[in-house]
Amino acid sequence: MQEKDCIFCKIVRGEVPAKKVYEDDKVLAFHDINPVAPVHILIIPKKHIMGIQTLEPEDECLVGHMFYVARKIAEDLGIAPDENLNKGYRLVFNVGKDAGQSVFHLHLHLIGGREMSWPPG
């Protein structure tokens, strides 16, 4: 199911352009339009899910697939840790407005390409 006015659903349908880096039958990954790091990719399910708070038990494999795709993209973009654990990346789900979720379609941020500090913002 897709939502008519959801910007990410519009990207899935090809109605809004995006700089895609990965696509399969379950997920789509593309560059964030407001990156916070040299590499900032959003991985979204093609199925409209509002967020973590609305996940159903049948979505468990889909969320696991999103993490697998994130790892593959990190490897492809050269930000995955090497054997000495140099480099690296951060995976983030923002859940709700107070956490910074601005698009209410489940999405996983893959952020890297620079040293990350903690705590974030």
From Swiss-Prot:
Organism encoding this protein: Aquifex aeolicus (strain VF5)
Annotated GO MF terms: hydrolase activity
Residue positions of motif Histidine triad motif: 105-109
SUPFAM superfamilies attached to this UniProt entry: HIT-like
PANTHER family (alphabetical): HISTIDINE TRIAD HIT PROTEIN (PTHR23089)
Every HIT domain range: 7-121
Coiled-coil intervals: none
GO CC terms of this entry: cytoplasm
Superkingdom, taxonomy of origin: Bacteria
Protein name: Uncharacterized HIT-like protein aq_141
InterPro entries: Histidine_triad_CS, Histidine_triad_HIT, HIT-like, HIT-like_sf
Gene3D superfamilies: HIT-like
